[in-house]
């Protein structure tokens, strides 16, 4: 466990206790998978202090944790998250924009990663989740992504349909071990899959796991940094040779 992780865990407990002792809602910054994993390790130390994790939309990977609840405090405070719609001025002449393109352009403005949530892209339009106190600056400062001129505005509603799209995928494996599933879905060898676990790049429901033989539970989200994420839907049948047909929802 690194010193930075220990400091982060102490910070979580400080924020939780501040909420409890002062009777107010307290928010973290946006948390990535590694930070969420650190939070999962101190949940038992919260002594029943309520919390909620939310990233601006159902299915968001990067989330803010809010300590406190309406039931306990008697009032409600929404998450301080703004949604920025970023679209090319002209789709006809726009580059094909990726998550990396959007993130790089925003970070080049001098913005801290901790103030940014997910960036979802639909039909070459980016939906950027950001802290309220930085959103207006992004809107006024981000004029170009890659070589494409952009038009930005803060929106109150997300596009209809699923912002985070998944596709059903079936893989065949000898068992439900998580390392085998990761290897099959991302087209790599078991050895390469095992390396990802050793590097602490695999997370189950936001908690890091190095256990290559872990059997996922139905509904758990498996995230692999640098590769993608999926929802485990279980084994629904067997092949004639006895292999399992495993179904997953893979984020696309």
Question: What spans do the regions from the language model cover?
Answer:
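Basic (Lys/Arg-enriched) interaction patch that binds polyanionic ligands
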Residues: 175-226
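Ferredoxin-like alpha/beta domains used as RNA- or RNAP-binding modules
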Residues: 1-179, 185, 208, 221, ...
């Amino acid at each position: 466990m690194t010193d930075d992780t220990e400091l982060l865990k102490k910070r979580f407990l400080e924020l939780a206790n501040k909420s409890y002792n002062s009777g107010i809602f307290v928010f973290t910054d946006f948390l990535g998978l590694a930070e969420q994993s650190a939070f999962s390790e101190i949940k038992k130390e919260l002594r029943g202090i309520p919390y909620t994790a939310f990233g601006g939309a159902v299915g968001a990977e990067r989330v803010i944790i809010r300590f406190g609840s309406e039931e306990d405090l008697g009032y409600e405070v929404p998450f301080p998250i703004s949604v920025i719609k970023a679209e090319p001025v002209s789709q006809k002449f726009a580059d094909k924009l990726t998550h990396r393109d959007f993130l790089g352009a925003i970070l080049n403005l001098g913005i801290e990663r901790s103030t940014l949530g997910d960036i979802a892209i639909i039909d070459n339009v980016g939906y950027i989740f950001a802290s309220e106190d930085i959103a207006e600056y992004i809107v006024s400062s981000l004029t170009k992504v890659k070589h494409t001129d952009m038009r930005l505005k803060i929106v109150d509603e997300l596009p209809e349909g699923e912002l985070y799209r998944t596709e059903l995928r079936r893989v065949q494996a000898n068992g439900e071990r998580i390392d085998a599933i990761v290897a099959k879905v991302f087209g790599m060898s078991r050895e390469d899959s095992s390396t990802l676990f050793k590097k602490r790049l695999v997370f189950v429901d936001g908690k890091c796991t190095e256990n290559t033989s872990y059997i996922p539970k139905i509904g758990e989200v498996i995230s692999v940094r640098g590769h993608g994420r999926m929802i485990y839907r279980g084994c629904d049948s067997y092949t004639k040779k006895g292999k399992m047909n495993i179904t997953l929802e893979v984020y696309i």
